[in-house]
Design a protein with these regions (language model features):
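N-terminal module-boundary/linker segments of secreted carbohydrate-active enzymes
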Residues: 24-61, 193-195, 206-214
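Active-site-proximal flexible loops/turns
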Residues: 20, 69, 118-121
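Secretory targeting and sorting signals
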Residues: 1-26
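Domain-level detector of nuclease and nuclease-like folds
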Residues: 92-214
Length: 214
């Protein structure tokens, strides 16, 4: 299976096809129904170390790390990319706080479901290879997102019971991205998280999630 080619990489770089796990037509489900369908389990952080999720790698060996790939993909203008796939400028919209950013150093690449939360929710039982794939998931635009460093660090490893984006306009999209990511990777929710997701989703009308899984 072939990944969508990430755009705007330096012409001097050899660009290889990227692999994807997404089906041609992803199945959709109403957000509220998706929340109810997520597996339920208590969380445990025993044994967690961030280093158990290797990132940012150059999976396709095109010279660009996962971080660079996301910056290139999400820039709303053609990014300037220097030798070594160093992204030096572009235009990014941080949807968590509705900010437009033109300096890549002001951005973090957020794991939609943080690494620690993924560990708590089932990744503790994965192989090292699957954890690496999770931490560098370019197969879904929901998995990794460029946002202001300030909001990413405010979020840290918290779930929606503990943190939501500062912009109310972002909440429904954030919930959909969160639930879709949990579906994609077969991750569970605990009681507080499920209750928070359910309550927040009440104002999200026809918002849908992607239920494709890998």
């Amino acid at each position: 299976m072939i990944k969508t080619l990430r755009a705007c990489v330096l012409a001097s770089l050899t660009v290889l096809p990227l692999l994807t796990a997404l089906p041609a037509h992803a199945a959709e489900m109403p957000l509220a129904e998706g929340i109810r369908a997520l597996p339920f389990a208590a969380e445990s952080r025993a044994g967690y170390e961030r280093t158990k999720f290797k990132h940012w790698v150059d999976e396709d060996r095109d010279g660009c790390s996962t971080r660079a790939e996301v910056l290139i993909e999400e820039s709303r203008t053609k990014p300037v990319v220097e030798a070594g796939c160093k992204v030096v400028s572009g235009t990014w919209f941080s949807y968590y706080d509705q900010q437009t950013i033109t300096t890549p150093s002001a951005l973090d690449i957020d794991h939609m479901v943080p690494l620690a939360e993924a560990w708590d929710s089932g990744a503790s039982g994965w192989t090292a290879q699957r954890r690496e794939a999770y931490a560098n998931d370019l197969g879904s635009s929901r998995s990794l997102v460029a946002v202001t460093a300030k909001t990413n660090r405010s979020k840290s490893d918290q779930d929606p019971a503990e943190w939501m984006p500062p912009s109310a306009e972002a909440h429904c999209a954030y919930l959909a991205d969160w639930v879709s990511t949990k579906f994609r990777w077969g991750l569970s929710v605990d009681m507080a998280e499920r209750d928070a997701l359910t309550g927040q989703a009440e104002g999200c009308g026809s918002t849908t999630i992607d239920t494709s899984a890998i």
